[in-house]
Amino acid sequence: MCIRDRHRFEKKTLFMIGTFLYVITDLIIYYITGYENFWLLAFIATFGFIGFGMAGVMAWSMIADTIEYGEWKSGFRAEGVLNAAHVFVFKLSVGFSAWLAGVILESTDYVANAIDQSPETLNGLFIMGYIFPAVAGTIAIIVTYFNKYDSNFYERIFSELKQRQS
């Protein structure tokens, strides 16, 4: 049985669908819902979280595929190095995001422990929570769309690796 028969959808297609779902819900929340109606925001955000979870699972499964790709390209199997590199980039992005959040909070006059925040601060928080992820998700969709790695390509890599091992 070939790999293509075991999977109904491509990983990258599911990743793009999940990412598109959270991008669309983020844009709906920002431009239509707003933050005044909590229950409507929570209801719409639920669909975004489903998409975000789907994209996250697919991203991790595609990271595992890079191990075979790396072995196919270089002849060396480097699970540890690839996983460590991914964790490093992930932590680097978390650090950058924290720095960016601080810059935005500072530029929108955020007041710590204040019960009421200014409209600029609330809008800055809303942009940080919905527009930035929508932009990042759109970039991820574009990059993934042009990625040639699909089940046919993976099947070719996997069969060539099996031939090398035998």
Language model: regions and residue ranges:
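Membrane-embedded alpha-helical bundles of multi-pass transporters/translocases
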Residues: 4-166
